[in-house]
A protein has these predicted regions:
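N-terminal intrinsically disordered/low-complexity leader segments
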Residues: 1-13, 24
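Hydrophobic alpha-helical connector segments
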Residues: 63, 77-108, 157-161
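Amphipathic alpha-helical packing segments from all-alpha helical-bundle domains
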Residues: 73, 103-113, 121-148, 156-159, ...
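Hydrophobic/aromatic residues within well-ordered alpha-helical segments
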Residues: 14, 57, 64, 68, ...
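Helix-turn-helix
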Residues: 17, 21-63
Length: 197
């Protein structure tokens, strides 16, 4: 007996399946190829389910950005929690998590690149990006406060660390033979040590 072309699932599972399919399409084919038809085909569902669950591809891409951002946040939070109570160790764990799976992942990089391309053209993605990065910086500011960095310096330090980590993460994912995770961590740690002096 042959497998049916489309499968049935509970609404939450179907929504997650569509979100994960969207991330794969974005990573593999880029934002310009993230159509209802391509995503439905990737998820193994009818195109009508995209409209049913999300109203259209734009809302699905927003949901995918939120999902991917939440996964990154969860990985960062888990690393910080596992580091114990020492403030400097917690900050180091936050940074190091960016250079290890599941964050240091070429498929994730490809998905983020697609999202970054959409920020300019789609206000909803731009707003979500701003909120996501504000959350990252807020977490860093909390970690920096625990490291006793002066309040006036925390915001700029969080921006600098975010930019530094993003740049190293990008290079690590694009050219792992040029920059490995250990070297990325070392560079980040040296710069953060200078910020904390």
């Amino acid at each position: 007996m042959s497998k049916p072309a489309f499968t049935r699932a509970e609404p939450d599972a179907r929504r997650l399946s569509l979100i994960e399919a969207t991330a794969r399409v974005l990573a593999r084919d880029g934002a310009s190829s993230a159509s209802v038809r391509a995503i439905a085909l990737e998820a193994g569902v009818s195109p009508g389910l995209v409209a049913h669950h999300f109203g259209g591809v734009d809302a699905l891409i927003v949901a995918t950005y939120r999902h991917v951002g939440d996964r990154v946040s969860a990985a960062l939070d888990a690393a910080v929690a596992a580091a114990g109570n020492d403030p400097r160790a917690r900050l180091s764990a936050y940074v190091a998590a960016s250079f290890a799976p599941p964050i240091a992942d070429r498929a994730l990089l490809a998905t983020w690149i697609a999202f970054w391309g959409l920020i300019i053209a789609q206000p909803a993605i731009a707003a979500l990006h701003d909120a996501q990065y504000a959350s990252y910086r807020g977490g860093l500011e909390t970690l920096l406060a625990a490291c006793e960095l002066a309040p006036a310096a925390r915001r700029h330090a969080a921006i600098a660390i975010t930019a530094l980590v993003d740049g190293l993460w990008l290079e690590l994912c694009l050219s792992p033979r040029v920059l490995d995770a250990e070297t990325a961590r070392g560079i980040a740690e040296a710069q953060i040590a200078a910020l904390l002096r």
